[in-house]
Amino acid sequence: MDRVDGRKQGQIRPVRMTPNYNKYAEGSVLIEVGDTRVICTATVEERVPPFLKGLGKGWVTAEYSMLPRATGSRTIREAARGKLGGRTMEIQRLIGRALRSVVNLEALGERSLTMDCDVIQADGGTRTASITGAYVAMIFALNRLVEQGMLEKIPVSDFIAATSVGIVKGRPVIDLCYAEDSVAEVDMNVVMTGTGRFVEIQGTGEEATFSREEMNQLLDLAAAGIEELNKVQRQVLGDIAAKIG
């Protein structure tokens, strides 16, 4: 049986990345995963957080937000509420952790990269799309530092991408759209490297449980999907991709 949008069980949504989407940022990309769209920008600053001052190493962090009408009904801006929501804080920490897992912070030197992931349209998988797009924006920014002679080489050991998987109506599926995510019995986000190593797995039963066998099926789906995402990343980066690792 096909899914709500006609996809097969192990088929990710169409992925498109538009590089240099923001003319001011050191690195940027608009990532589109189905109807989910996220603008990812990288900002380089020649300073580090106070806890890293004088240690000779850099930092990579992330911020995440959604436009009020990124969803079906308008949501109040978090700035208007006066504080970040728990979901937002969790997602931006996830993005930062994922990117730092492959960055040599010592080789980066005492400078910071701030990744801004702004969702302009949400249809499921915004956090995983943010990670996949932010990685590309980060590489563009680091390559600029290399070209300017500020870094000897791109201090990144591997590719990073992420996707969602879940169990919907008893079937393991990949890259859930909102309609699927809202009724999923199991929801899981998976972040992996280009060499197939796991960075993070977030899995939850929604009023349901799942077996070790089902979890393995979900991870196999995620690994195959992330391999496809890596191919898109390589295509967008072009010759820069060969400088990674």
Curated annotation (Swiss-Prot):
InterPro entries: ExoRNase_PH_dom1, ExoRNase_PH_dom2, ExoRNase_PH_dom2_sf, PNPase/RNase_PH_dom_sf, Ribosomal_Su5_D2-typ_SF, RNase_PH, RNase_PH_bac-type, RNase_PH_CS. Keywords: Nucleotidyltransferase, RNA-binding, rRNA processing, Transferase, tRNA processing, tRNA-binding. Its EC number is 2.7.7.56. It catalyses: tRNA(n+1) + phosphate = tRNA(n) + a ribonucleoside 5'-diphosphate. The keyword Hydrolase does not apply. Phosphate binds at residues 87, 125-127. One of its GO terms (molecular function) is tRNA nucleotidyltransferase activity. It is an enzyme of class 2 (transferase). GO terms for biological process: rRNA catabolic process; rRNA processing; tRNA processing. Homohexameric ring arranged as a trimer of dimers. Phosphorolytic 3'-5' exoribonuclease that plays an important role in tRNA 3'-end maturation. Removes nucleotide residues following the 3'-CCA terminus of tRNAs; can also add nucleotides to the ends of RNA molecules by using nucleoside diphosphates as substrates, but this may not be physiologically important. Probably plays a role in initiation of 16S rRNA degradation (leading to ribosome degradation) during starvation. Belongs to the RNase PH family. This is Ribonuclease PH. The gene is rph.
